[in-house]
C-alpha cells in the first residue's frame, strides 16, 4: 500500500454540523483507508424471479434472488497518525444498536475518542460490527430472526441519561435528566439518528468477523463498549497471543469465567461511569464484570477496575465517549496504557 503524508481537519458530522470551532487542531496522518474482513458465502434457492423498477421512471429489471451471496463481512476504517506513539494498533468496538460512529464524534459536535486517540498517537481501527452500518445485514432467508429497533425514549431511559422509565419526553424542557449528568442532552436528538437495528441471533457471525480482524491487524489493544464486552473478551480468550491490552468500557456482557485464565498475560482496564446504583439493570451488569475480573485475578491476571466517581470523575452516562468530559476519560485510559508501556 502506497503511503502518503497529509493533514486533514476531521470535522464533526452531527448537528450542529460542520462546527470546526468545536474540533481540535488538524490531524496529521501518514495514511488512512478502509477494508472489509471476514464473512461467508451462502446460497439461496427456490425463490421466484421478480421484475422490478429500481428507480423512478427506470426500465424494469429482472431480479433473480437465487444464487450465491456474500454475507457477514465487517467494515473497518483506519487512521494512522504521522506521529505514532502507541506501540500497537488500537481497535475500537462499539455497543449494541450502534456503529463505529460511537467513537467518531459527539452528538453536540465535539471530538470523539477516535480523534482524541489519533492525536495521542495511536493507530486506530474503527469498525461497524456485522449487521451494522457499512457492514450491512443479510436477508431474512439467511437470518431468520427479526431485527430489534429502539424508540427515541429507550436509550435516554436505559443509558443512565434520564432518571429511568418515563424520564424522556418529546418536549426537551420536560425531560427528566439525572442531576449533574455529563451527556450532551441538547444533542440527544442527534444521537438517536445514529441508532440502527440489531439482531439477537448473530453473535457467532459478529465474533467470527472480529476474530478475522484480530488475525489481520494484531498484535493490538482492544477497546470495546457495552454489548461488545462479550465479543471482546471472547475474541481475546481465543487469541490471547495477539492482544496486548484490553480496555473494557462499561461491558454489558463479560467473558467466560472458566476461560479467564487465558487472559493471564493481558493487562486489563475496566471502566464504569456514574449513577449505576440508581439503575434497575446496571448493578447486576457491573457485578457480572466484577465477577469476571475476579476470575481473571484468581487465574493470575492483572485487572484494574475504575469506577469513575471514585476517582473524582462524575456525571458519566453509559455513553462515556460522548459525554462532555469524554476527554478526561480518554486521558485516564491513555495514561493507563502508557503506564503499561504500550505508548511512548
Give the ranges of each region predicted by the language model.
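Conserved acidic catalytic loop of the alpha/beta-hydrolase fold
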Residues: 200-221
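N-terminal cap/lid segment of alpha/beta-hydrolase-fold proteins
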Residues: 22-85
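Conserved alpha/beta-hydrolase
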Residues: 110-136
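Catalytic active-site module of serine/aspartate enzymes centered on a nucleophile-bearing elbow/loop
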Residues: 313-315, 319-344
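Gly/Ala-rich beta-loop-alpha elbow adjacent to hydrolase catalytic centers
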Residues: 223-232, 236
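Active-site glycine-rich loops that stabilize anionic/oxyanionic intermediates
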Residues: 94-106
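The feature captures the conserved acid-bearing segment of alpha/beta-hydrolase catalytic domains
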Residues: 248-308
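Short beta-strand element of the alpha/beta-hydrolase
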Residues: 86-96
